[in-house]
Amino acid sequence: MRLEKVQEALKTKKIHYEYTEENGCGSIDFMFRGLRFHIWEYEDRVWGAETNVFEAGRSQDIEGDYEKIISGEILSWPDMLPGM
């Protein structure tokens, strides 16, 4: 299981997501307020993740402590309304 900090942030915000893992890299896809988001982990000499959580229409690579950075952004979002 990879991207555990990110998964915990999504659970805290009650955001439903799909998790898959391939070649040792985690992948998360989810919707929030009608927009599709992704977090796709990679290992290319360094570990990182491609994501669009900072801007729904634009992907960017995050390296270093990418799980902390991405989960921090998700936790800053408003809570989901009940029933959403």
For the regions a language model picked out, list residue spans one by one.
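Amphipathic, interaction-prone secondary-structure segments
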Residues: 13-47
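Intrinsically disordered, low-complexity regulatory segments enriched in Ser/Thr/Pro
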Residues: 35-68, 72
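Long, compositionally biased, intrinsically disordered regions
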Residues: 77-84
